[in-house]
């Protein structure tokens, strides 16, 4: 058996999320179908760096999987995966990794980006690739709110009720909002890990602050109280992208 690491991108619009689910179309299931073909039709179970929800996209999700036999030509393997998976999945890179390397448990940091269209009328061409908010937003208020998210905090107040993780302390290295033009914003979050729906809950809260329906100090209240009820709504999934998963260097195999 040989272990491989792959970097993939996908349009999450028509998926019920990344992780396999019964009677649902998922990214994991589509890739595993192709991996099985490339593995003499023996089942292959891949592991991802984490899940993404239905409608959420990825520029740089990372997975690992094992295939029978010796190491294969990496470009041929990448090409085979890329051309046999559906059009809404792209396999960008395949690498060899040690047998004990794990996409989820290896130390890493993640970067998420969130794209928001802020205009009176919504563009029909962006309905699957950006979130939309039609009411006025104050850029300076949103900048102030984002700055308060940087650092090590207990993010219980920003996670959804379905989270099964006990330790909800995470470190955010970068929380930035960029005004791309008059009608478009990009949120950037880089950290050592994120809780279930944490990024979308933070974005929803910052949007509410930008709309002057919450004070900037609400961020402090959410962090100290650990109460989800003090935060804003969960932002829509279509604006969210897993941009990059960055690992410590792998030793030569």
Curated annotation (Swiss-Prot):
The keyword tRNA processing applies. Keywords: Isomerase, tRNA processing. Coiled coil: none annotated. It catalyses: uridine(38/39/40) in tRNA = pseudouridine(38/39/40) in tRNA. Its EC number is 5.4.99.12. GO terms for molecular function: RNA binding; tRNA pseudouridine(38-40) synthase activity. The active site is at residue 53. Substrate binds at residue 112. InterPro entries: PsdUridine_synth_cat_dom_sf, PsdUridine_synth_TruA, PsdUridine_synth_TruA_a/b_dom, PsdUridine_synth_TruA_C, TruA/RsuA/RluB/E/F_N. The keyword tRNA processing applies. GO terms for biological process: tRNA pseudouridine synthesis. Belongs to the tRNA pseudouridine synthase TruA family. Formation of pseudouridine at positions 38, 39 and 40 in the anticodon stem and loop of transfer RNAs. Homodimer. This is tRNA pseudouridine synthase A. It comes from Lactococcus lactis subsp. cremoris (strain SK11).
